Amino acid sequence: MKYYLFTSLSILLSIISANAQNGKIIEQKPLVFADTTIARIEKTIPHAKALVNDVDFFKIIYLSDGLKVTGYLSMPKKAGKYPCIIFNRGGNREFSALNDNFVLRVLGEVANWGYVVVGSQYRGNAGGEGKEEFGGSDVNDILNLIPFLSHIDKADTSRIGMFGWSRGGMMTYLALTKTNQIKAAVVGSGAADAFINTKKRPGMDSVYAELVPGYFQNRDSVLKTRSAVYWADKICKTTPLLLLCGSADWRVSPEEQLEMVNKLYENKHPLRFEFFEGGQHSLIEHADEVNHVTRNFLDMYVRDKKTWPSLEPHGN
């Protein structure tokens, strides 16, 4: 009995210790871009060199549930306190992992708007410890970026937003069921119904099978926990959402996102929706518009902390 109590106490203390360490920065290493990388990006983003001149970039390692997890950080070089954005990547494992090219183009762009931007590779990826679960315990790797930001001098942690793309949209929805600290969130081409996803793309079944614990024993249950359309009412109501969707997206069917819009509307969740005609998964054809609406939304509800208007029927 004494041994059992001692063991239980040891486990409890280990958990408490791990939780206390969440977000601790293990490494923050400056990222230097090769001239060839900048030149390549300048073909699509002419101001790439200006981003490098105005924004600091870092590769990071931080603690999440006792695991060393890798990611990236970007922030304006100019002194000051800035609102923050947690960026949630898409893909799985090394597919669509964050890389120097993407970080300069996307995280650098958002940082240049006047934000501290941090993104996780999720556990088990890019040299990180553990194993990702495609919407399981790896959601904590996002949540633990909140205490991570408290260690960044330029970060104003009273103003944190979130921005997720594709699988990162699913991760954003999941994170928003567990925290009310996010002032607003943007979801681009966001996965919201795993059943539609596996029906439209049967190959995704193998991804779930390889990454999701309990998949073979209880497929419907684990897919439902990764399908926000089934628990849209659990998403924090004080976090306004901007959903971006392209009508020609084959990776995440517009059906998923339209269904999610309806569920959010039914639950009177503060919501804005942009549907881009002919837009593919990346919405690259509408890049300028996407940047414009995303920046305006984040500036309004994260930077400026604007209050969402009444959702009840009103007016003349």
Predicted segments, located by residue:
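N-terminal cap/lid segment of alpha/beta-hydrolase-fold proteins
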Residues: 35-79
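Short substrate-entry loop that stabilizes the transition state in hydrolases
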Residues: 80-82, 87-130
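Mobile cap/lid helix-loop segments that gate and shape the active-site cleft of serine hydrolases
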Residues: 97-98, 190, 195-234
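Alpha/beta-hydrolase active-site loop
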Residues: 133-153
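Short glycine-enriched nucleophile-adjacent loop
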Residues: 169-180
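Short beta-strand/loop motif that positions the catalytic acidic residue
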Residues: 242-245, 249
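Conserved alpha/beta-hydrolase "acid-adjacent" motif
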Residues: 250-256
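C-terminal catalytic histidine-bearing segment of alpha/beta-hydrolase fold enzymes
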Residues: 258-316
